[in-house]
Design a protein with these regions (language model features):
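A short N-terminal helical cap/helix-turn-helix that marks the beginning
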Residues: 3-26, 43
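Conserved AMP-binding/adenylate-forming core of the ANL superfamily
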Residues: 23-78, 95-100
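Active-site-adjacent beta-strand anchor residues
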Residues: 7, 66, 111-114
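Aromatic/hydrophobic pocket-lining residues that form π-stacking "cages" and hydrophobic walls in ligand
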Residues: 14, 76, 121
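Short, flexible loop segments at the rims of nucleotide/cofactor-binding pockets, characterized by
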Residues: 2-5, 40-41, 88-90
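Structural core segment of the AMP-binding/adenylate-forming
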Residues: 54-55, 82-147
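Flexible, low-complexity linker/hinge segments
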Residues: 1-9, 142-147
Protein backbone atom coordinates (compact mmCIF):
# COMPACT_ATOMS: atom_id res chain seq x y z
CA UNK A 1 0.00 0.00 0.00
CA UNK A 2 1.28 3.48 -0.89
CA UNK A 3 1.49 6.05 1.87
CA UNK A 4 -0.18 9.35 0.96
CA UNK A 5 2.06 12.41 1.35
CA UNK A 6 0.30 15.51 2.61
CA UNK A 7 1.70 19.03 2.35
CA UNK A 8 3.34 20.02 5.64
CA UNK A 9 3.42 23.82 5.35
CA UNK A 10 1.19 26.60 4.09
CA UNK A 11 3.55 27.11 1.14
CA UNK A 12 3.54 23.40 0.30
CA UNK A 13 -0.27 23.36 0.44
CA UNK A 14 -0.50 26.32 -1.95
CA UNK A 15 1.97 24.71 -4.36
CA UNK A 16 0.00 21.45 -4.20
CA UNK A 17 -3.37 23.15 -4.73
CA UNK A 18 -1.95 25.32 -7.51
CA UNK A 19 -0.64 22.26 -9.34
CA UNK A 20 -3.97 20.42 -9.02
CA UNK A 21 -6.44 23.26 -9.59
CA UNK A 22 -4.76 26.60 -10.27
CA UNK A 23 -8.06 28.33 -11.08
CA UNK A 24 -9.75 27.33 -7.81
CA UNK A 25 -10.48 30.26 -5.50
CA UNK A 26 -8.07 30.77 -2.60
CA UNK A 27 -9.44 34.08 -1.27
CA UNK A 28 -12.39 36.38 -1.84
CA UNK A 29 -12.12 39.93 -0.50
CA UNK A 30 -15.35 40.94 1.23
CA UNK A 31 -14.48 44.63 0.70
CA UNK A 32 -13.78 44.52 -3.05
CA UNK A 33 -15.16 41.12 -4.16
CA UNK A 34 -11.74 40.51 -5.72
CA UNK A 35 -10.96 36.80 -6.02
CA UNK A 36 -7.49 35.30 -5.88
CA UNK A 37 -6.93 31.82 -7.31
CA UNK A 38 -4.41 29.28 -6.05
CA UNK A 39 -2.38 29.91 -9.19
CA UNK A 40 -2.33 33.65 -8.52
CA UNK A 41 -1.44 33.27 -4.85
CA UNK A 42 1.35 30.85 -5.72
CA UNK A 43 2.84 33.25 -8.28
CA UNK A 44 2.49 36.25 -5.95
CA UNK A 45 3.97 34.65 -2.84
CA UNK A 46 6.89 33.26 -4.82
CA UNK A 47 7.64 36.74 -6.19
CA UNK A 48 7.37 38.44 -2.78
CA UNK A 49 9.30 35.63 -1.09
CA UNK A 50 12.13 35.88 -3.60
CA UNK A 51 12.41 39.63 -3.01
CA UNK A 52 12.51 39.06 0.77
CA UNK A 53 15.27 36.48 0.37
CA UNK A 54 17.21 38.87 -1.88
CA UNK A 55 17.33 41.43 0.96
CA UNK A 56 19.82 39.14 2.67
CA UNK A 57 17.99 38.77 5.97
CA UNK A 58 18.21 35.31 7.47
CA UNK A 59 15.31 32.90 7.27
CA UNK A 60 13.65 32.78 10.65
CA UNK A 61 13.90 36.57 10.98
CA UNK A 62 10.78 38.52 11.94
CA UNK A 63 8.95 40.74 9.47
CA UNK A 64 6.09 42.87 10.79
CA UNK A 65 2.90 43.93 9.04
CA UNK A 66 1.07 47.16 9.95
CA UNK A 67 -2.07 47.12 7.87
CA UNK A 68 -5.81 46.71 8.21
CA UNK A 69 -7.06 43.39 6.90
CA UNK A 70 -6.86 43.33 3.11
CA UNK A 71 -6.07 41.07 0.19
CA UNK A 72 -2.54 42.48 0.12
CA UNK A 73 -1.95 41.81 3.82
CA UNK A 74 -3.17 38.21 3.43
CA UNK A 75 -0.86 37.64 0.47
CA UNK A 76 2.05 39.29 2.29
CA UNK A 77 1.51 37.23 5.46
CA UNK A 78 1.40 34.05 3.39
CA UNK A 79 4.53 35.03 1.44
CA UNK A 80 6.45 35.78 4.65
CA UNK A 81 5.69 32.47 6.35
CA UNK A 82 6.00 30.46 3.13
CA UNK A 83 9.50 31.86 2.60
CA UNK A 84 10.74 30.80 6.02
CA UNK A 85 10.34 34.07 7.89
CA UNK A 86 8.22 34.90 10.94
CA UNK A 87 5.23 37.15 10.25
CA UNK A 88 4.41 39.60 13.05
CA UNK A 89 0.98 41.18 12.46
CA UNK A 90 0.86 44.34 14.56
CA UNK A 91 -2.21 45.21 16.65
CA UNK A 92 -3.01 48.67 15.32
CA UNK A 93 -5.18 49.63 18.30
CA UNK A 94 -2.49 48.81 20.87
CA UNK A 95 -0.92 52.28 20.88
CA UNK A 96 2.60 53.47 20.15
CA UNK A 97 4.27 52.21 23.34
CA UNK A 98 2.97 48.64 22.97
CA UNK A 99 3.80 48.63 19.26
CA UNK A 100 7.33 49.86 20.05
CA UNK A 101 7.75 47.03 22.54
CA UNK A 102 6.40 44.47 20.05
CA UNK A 103 8.64 45.71 17.24
CA UNK A 104 11.74 45.68 19.43
CA UNK A 105 10.95 42.39 21.20
CA UNK A 106 10.20 40.60 17.91
CA UNK A 107 13.46 41.93 16.42
CA UNK A 108 11.56 42.76 13.22
CA UNK A 109 13.89 43.57 10.35
CA UNK A 110 11.18 45.16 8.21
CA UNK A 111 7.72 46.56 8.77
CA UNK A 112 5.35 46.62 5.82
CA UNK A 113 3.19 49.68 6.49
CA UNK A 114 -0.13 50.71 4.96
CA UNK A 115 -0.37 54.47 4.37
CA UNK A 116 -3.17 54.81 6.95
CA UNK A 117 -0.82 53.36 9.59
CA UNK A 118 2.35 55.28 8.78
CA UNK A 119 2.05 57.98 11.49
CA UNK A 120 1.33 55.39 14.18
CA UNK A 121 4.25 53.20 13.11
CA UNK A 122 6.64 56.16 12.82
CA UNK A 123 5.68 57.10 16.38
CA UNK A 124 6.23 53.53 17.61
CA UNK A 125 9.57 53.19 15.82
CA UNK A 126 10.79 56.43 17.40
CA UNK A 127 10.14 54.94 20.87
CA UNK A 128 12.26 51.81 20.43
CA UNK A 129 15.98 51.24 20.03
CA UNK A 130 16.39 48.74 17.21
CA UNK A 131 16.87 49.56 13.54
CA UNK A 132 13.93 48.59 11.37
CA UNK A 133 13.19 49.38 7.73
CA UNK A 134 9.71 50.54 6.71
CA UNK A 135 8.26 49.41 3.38
CA UNK A 136 5.01 50.73 1.92
CA UNK A 137 2.03 48.38 1.63
CA UNK A 138 -0.89 49.33 -0.59
CA UNK A 139 -4.01 47.37 0.47
CA UNK A 140 -4.86 46.64 -3.18
CA UNK A 141 -1.55 46.64 -5.06
CA UNK A 142 0.57 45.00 -2.34
CA UNK A 143 4.04 45.80 -1.01
CA UNK A 144 6.31 48.39 -2.61
CA UNK A 145 9.27 46.05 -3.02
CA UNK A 146 11.13 48.51 -5.22
CA UNK A 147 11.37 51.21 -2.53
Amino acid sequence: MTEVQFPETIGDQIIFNSSKSAEAVWLVSPETNQTISFGQVHETIMKIGQRLIETGIERGSSIAIASPNSTASCLLFTAIVSSGFVAVPLNLVAGSAILAYTIEHSEAKFIFVANDCRDLINSAVSLQNSKVNLIGLDPVMGPDLDA
